[in-house]
């Protein structure tokens, strides 16, 4: 699996190539093997690198909703299980993949601690990490507290050849049980000074970090005009940091959160300013559901009973209600929407 996993210096190299060639990697939240396999299949078909990520809630779902998650055990074991699945099946696909965990607030840090404990043992046995990266999201705290904690985790991740994602400014909307719909709009826009502070503190430890800087991003999907994205904030931050630290233009690796429903112009402009990763969840949830919905509507008369359909009262319907059939329909519509995301991100045949 090691050759298929993008991690450490290889991840940094991929990010640099992405900025040079003006493309970004889609980061897909998954909640089971159906979505994992659909991501791997799409990335393989398109010959393009991809990021598969687990949220705290998505990981819990993989382990099983009946498992007590008070101590984060379900989220820990679910994320580990999902990551192992990627390692185990990826040789069947051409895709190269970054395995990541999504937003982790302070109250959920024991989740990451549990993954790191397991990950340390995995790294000692294998010589490479189980996960490529983790995200720590303390954007609702004072920046000093945010970065001080992130520095401690960056040290731990660096020892495992992993990357840290941090967040500056808050992504609006609601996702995975976190509701920021009523947040002060000023917090939706990161300032260059904040990016500069984070960069100066983290670069002293390692270059293996990426920054989710807020530029009006909102989780979920909204009608056009209801969300005001300002990608120029990223440009201003790049220029500020470049001048202050005398480093090349676009040195910061930025992350675009809340990618669902975003316009192509905003996406491409953000890529111009150093975005190398864009999170997509809501659109793909709906896309998967579309396939299942349409199949059930189309085959309704074959799904009303186990035996008996328009072709005859004694004809069995097993081939219609077998979950593998309608789950595959969901995978196919999921893949179609994901392909569009790859196209929007200018990430087609980028492994050549």
What spans do the regions from the language model cover?
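N-terminal amphipathic alpha-helix/helix-capping segment at the start of soluble metabolic enzymes
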Residues: 1-26
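Alpha/beta enzyme core
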Residues: 9-17, 33-94, 105-250, 264-269, ...
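Short, conserved beta-strand segments within well-ordered enzyme catalytic domains
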Residues: 27-29, 51-53, 98-100
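Hydrophobic alpha-helical scaffolding
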Residues: 29, 72, 185-188, 227, ...
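Catalytic-face loop-and-helix region of soluble metabolic enzyme cores
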Residues: 91, 223, 233, 242-321
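Extended, intrinsically disordered, low-complexity segments
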Residues: 298-352
